[in-house]
Amino acid sequence: MDTSMPNQPKFLPRIEHNSSGATANSYVATASGNPFETDEEDEIFSRHKMVLRVPSNCTGDLMHLAVSRNWLVCLLGTPERTTLLRFFLPRAIPPGEAVLEKYLSGSGYKITRMFLDPTGHHIIIALVPKSATAGVSPDFLYIHCLESPQAQQLKVRRIEKFKDHEITAVAFNPYHGNESSTGPILLGTSRGLIFETELNPAADGHVQRKQLYDLGLGRPKYPITGLKLLRVPNSSRYIIVVTSPECIYTFQETLKAEERSLQAIFAGYVSGVQEPHCEERKTDLTFSQLRFFAPPNSKYPKQWAWLCGEGIRVGELSIEANSAATLIGNTLINLDFEKTMHLSYGERRLNTPKAFVLTEYHAVLLYADHVRAICLLNQEQVYQEAFDEARVGKPLSIERDELTGSIYVYTVKTVFNLRVTREERNVWRIYLDKGQYELATAHAAEDPEHLQLVLCQRADAAFADGSYQVAADYYAETDKSFEEVCLKFMVLPDKRPIINYVKKRLSRVTTKPMETDELDEDKMNIIKALVIWLIDLYLIQINMPDKDEEWRSSWQTEYDEFMMEAHVLSCTRQNRETVRQLIAEHADPRNMAQFAIAIGDYDEVVAQQLKAECYAEALQTLINQRNPELFYKYAPELITRLPKPTVDALMAQGSRLEVEKLVPTLIIMENREQREQTQRYLEFAIYKLNTTNDAIHNFLLHLYAEHEPKLLMKYLEIQGRDESLVHYDIYYAHKVCTDLDVKEARVFLECMLRKWISAVDLALTFDMKLAKETASRPSDSKIRRKLWLRIAYHDIKGTNDVKKALNLLKECDLLRIEDLLPFFADFEKIDNFKEAICDALRDYNQRIQELQREMAETTEQTDRVTAELQQLRQHSLTVESQDTCEICEMMLLVKPFFIFICGHKFHSDCLEKHVVPLLTKEQCRRLGTLKQQLEAEVQTQAQPQSGALSKQQAMELQRKRAALKTEIEDILAADCLFCGLLISTIDQPFVDDWEQVNVEWE
């Protein structure tokens, strides 16, 4: 046998040595049966030798190794000495060291197993007698690890409570354990017993021991090979998984939040209320191994695996709080143990794994002379590498750090780090080959090339199965030739798949970014072609003969939604003629109108609808659009067909329509209904929209005069009698009313035109009451008297009706009996007028007496005012020398001053300074003018030639100057500043001239 190559297992393919590798133990993984890796890719698994800084005084072979949270603990042994070393892998610091020889050699013990808790601070070492004659019973050591800036401290203690029990498995408690205490943990023994205990450095000699369950049922040899404590996320349900060589058990129970002990989990099973879930597998192995995989930094495992006599069983863990099953899945990786039954012990040893670890997609198995990795998904071997025992030593076991995911393989001489590089790289291909397309798509999502392969194969499979709609969806996501895919679907009678495929391709094009103008032009051409084709496909389905209304309605709805998409609208607007021609070829007037609406061509829509005599649809189209010009254009025709709905629509538009543009289109009125609706809109425009346009008012006035005289009078009254405020042409209105003989309105208008005589004369022809009201309207009493005389003449002349004359005297106080007498025929007796004449005389007498009384009161008031003025001339106020100005508070007598009757005193300049801002603009201008004139007079008198003035001229100048000063004082001192001016301005606005303020701000 070639000594350069270690023995190769019989049922595994030989892996050729790669002589060009960087190390002596480097092998090519691609030749091991992984068809997906290329030589250019990094290997999924690669072995690298680790260099541990072992102290020089520590020698011997590596016996056991455990790793957790980057803490690596190993045992080195020689016949004379056994040493425990504890390394912190991220930093090159001296390891912690503990010599265990005093616990071993002198007592006849040997170490069988070593367990490390998840924190890396608690170590359990199982001890058994070296031989049956050693005279000792199984035991275990507990080592607590502490760190300080200077060194690590490893405290070793023998746990006497567990004598006679060989510890074969430990379930640490990650939920209650910490660096200072393990919390409640479970210990499994070689006889199938499960104990609960809690270890910490402070409990010297006081370790509690509780037996929770017996799987061995008294058998002397029933080792527990695996023990794991789990808690379902977001719940208080605990799960315990236990394995023996041929069975795997699960226990579960919900604990109280404050409960620490794990005894309650087994209580129901001990009492017989329930049985543990057990799965038994036939085996010829004397051991089994339980492993879990959790992603780095995860608290709950994702997968489990059990190495047993059948092979490796793999599955997932349930995370449902109420799930009865815990271990889900029953995938078996067959290791062909049965084929090794006829082999020799040495050959069987080479083909039986010593240990394994679990990654997310692989199981990594350690054999006596090699390590290999098997994919969990397809059970293909993806990696194998042999050990040169002469060089690196005999392989012992393999471990995985649950925190970091790092894998460590160790022999008696060396520790290797088995690196895992992108182990998921080929998962997509495996799922694809198995037809699990959802999973294949998910794992290929990050690689566009792989994703395209998955989608293409998935689409082909769906098409082959007749799932054409599904196939269309996936083809649309691929880069497969558009023409090729379309040819596949065009032969199908159902056009739904090809329509959806083209729509999805259109969606991809419209969302795909373009970088250059040239590409933009190409993109627009592609979009145009796809949109036009889709429109054609839709119209074919909509207008398919021999199809029911439900079919057409369904396709029509989908077509309408498609046409309203933003990119479709944009494309059809740019190519409106092409689309219009296509729709015309399908002879589809409804969709032609819908298309015109979609692109905003409402003019064409309304024209087509009117042409087809679809007046209601045309009106609705007008209502739905926003262009007022179309109302002006089509309202005349619509109001002849649909008067009321058209006016309702016009009124609903409100101020959006210009009444001045609209009304001229409504002049043609062929029947009463049209006239009434036109009148209704004019009333709306005037009373609701408050239009002031003369033409609108004149139009409505003409309609009223011709058809509704009563409404005309109401309109005129609303407009009022102030000719400057009315919005109609008074002269036009007068002419219309004259032509149409609307007398009452004509009287109203003649009053506004101040044609009082003609108004009264006209009113006398049909309404005496109106004539009297008209005669009473002028403000000039002379005109009123004249008008009442005309009424009297009309009422009395020729009738000699004294009673009417007397009534007129009562109605108008401007008329006297002597004014009416000429209207009567000659008479000799005045008996009929006696009472009226006497009343007139009494009235004259009363008025004379009132005038005399008023004259007496006026004389009396004049005398009283004269007396008061005389008293004021003699009134005086005393000014003290210490009096001060009310404004500046300085001595009053130092400057000219004013003193008011209220007692307030002001310097003249102080008063002027505060009064001027309160004056009106006119007063300010007048004050400035007076001051300039006064200054000019003073300068004139001061000139040298003024000495030559005569005495009369000098007196004239002095008088003029005094008059100016008096007028200035009348402005400034007209009222006390405090008692008059400031009080009178309290309700005045701060700003008088807002227009000026706005100009200044601009």
UniProtKB/Swiss-Prot annotation:
Task: Provide the effect of C979Y.
Answer: In dor-1; diminished fertility and an orange eye color
Alphabetically, which GO biological process terms does the record hold?
A: autophagosome maturation; border follicle cell migration; cell division; cellular response to starvation; compound eye pigmentation; determination of adult lifespan; early endosome to late endosome transport; endocytic recycling
**GO MF annotations, alphabetized:** protein-macromolecule adaptor activity; ubiquitin protein ligase activity; zinc ion binding
Recorded GO cellular component terms are: autophagosome membrane; CORVET complex; early endosome; endosome; HOPS complex; late endosome membrane; lysosomal membrane; lysosome
- Sorted alphabetically, which Gene3D superfamilies does this protein's record hold? Zinc/RING finger domain, C3HC4 (zinc finger)
- Is Acyltransferase one of the keywords UniProt gives this record? no
Give the SUPFAM superfamilies listed for this entry: RING/U-box
Say what happens when this gene is deleted. Flies display impaired deposition of pigment granules. Member of the 'granule group' of eye color genes as mutants affect deposition in pigment granules of two types of pigments, the ommochromes and drosopterins. RNAi-mediated knockdown results in late endosome fragmentation and mislocalization of Vps8. RNAi-mediated knockdown causes impaired autophagosome clearance in fat body cells of starved or wandering 3rd instar (L3) larvae. Conditional RNAi-mediated knock-down in muscle cells disrupts transverse-tubule (T-tubule) and myofibril remodeling in internal oblique muscles during metamorphosis.
Chief location: other
Zinc finger RING-type: from-to: 885-924
Membrane topology, from the record: Peripheral membrane protein
Give start and end residues of every CHCR repeat: 650-804
Modification Phosphoserine, positions = S344
Q: Which residues form a coiled coil?
A: 827-880
A single Pfam family it belongs to is Pep3_Vps18
Localization recorded for this chain is:
Early endosome; Late endosome membrane; Lysosome membrane; Cytoplasmic vesicle, Autophagosome
Q: Does the keyword Aminoacyl-tRNA synthetase apply?
A: no
Q: Which key words are in the record?
A: Autophagy, Coiled coil, Cytoplasmic vesicle, Endosome, Lysosome, Membrane, Metal-binding, Phosphoprotein, Protein transport, Transport, Zinc, Zinc-finger
Query: Function of this protein?
Result: Core component of the class C core vacuole/endosome tethering (CORVET) and the homotypic fusion and vacuole protein sorting (HOPS) tethering complexes involved in endo-lysosomal vesicle trafficking and lysosome biogenesis. The CORVET complex facilitates docking and fusion of endosomal vesicles during endosome maturation, acts upstream of HOPS, but is not involved in autophagic flux. The CORVET complex may cooperate with the early endosomal tether Rbsn-5 to mediate endosomal fusion.
Task: Summarize subunit and interaction data from the UniProt record for this chain.
Answer: Component of the class C core vacuole/endosome tethering (CORVET) complex composed of at least Vps8, dor/Vps18, car/Vps33A and Vps16A; unlike in other species, Vps11 is not part of the Drosophila complex. Due to the reduced number of components the Drosophila CORVET complex is often referred to as the miniCORVET complex. Interacts with car/Vps33A. Interacts with ema. Component of the homotypic fusion and vacuole protein sorting (HOPS) complex, composed of Vps16A, car/Vps33A, dor/Vps18, Vps39, Vps11 and lt/Vps41.
Per the record, the similarity remark reads: Belongs to the VPS18 family.
Share any extra remarks.
Answer: The name 'deep orange' was given due to the eye color phenotype cuased by hypomorphic mutations in the dor gene.
Q: What is this protein called?
A: Vacuolar protein sorting-associated protein 18 homolog
